[in-house]
Curated annotation (Swiss-Prot):
Biological source species: Setaria italica
Pfam families the UniProt entry points to: Bowman-Birk_leg
Keyword list, A-Z: Disulfide bond, Protease inhibitor, Serine protease inhibitor
Lineage, uppermost ranks: Eukaryota, Viridiplantae, Streptophyta, Embryophyta, Tracheophyta
Family the UniProt entry places it in: Belongs to the Bowman-Birk serine protease inhibitor family.
Annotated protein name in UniProt: Bowman-Birk type major trypsin inhibitor
Cross-referenced SMART domains: BowB (SM00269)
Sample GO molecular function, one term: serine-type endopeptidase inhibitor activity
Length: 67
């Protein structure tokens, strides 16, 4: 499965399978080095990016705790 392309993710969707297949829809200032497919969000100003990789493994923790 390799390295998770994001250390944490707030907008994460994962399948119910084991291992899970996860995507992260967080808007990033830049993608991590581990992210292979980085897509620029159209019309974003300042520019924002989404890592379009699908990660197979343990879901990432959330970046921000919801108060």
């Amino acid at each position: 499965s390799g390295e998770r392309p994001w250390k944490c993710c707030d907008l994460q969707t994962c399948t119910k399978s084991i291992p899970a297949f996860c995507r992260c829809r967080d808007l990033l200032e830049q993608c991590s080095d581990a992210c292979k497919e980085c897509g620029k969000v159209r019309d974003s100003d300042p520019p924002r990016y989404i890592c379009q990789d699908v990660y197979r493994g343990i879901p990432a923790p959330m970046c921000h705790e919801h108060q």
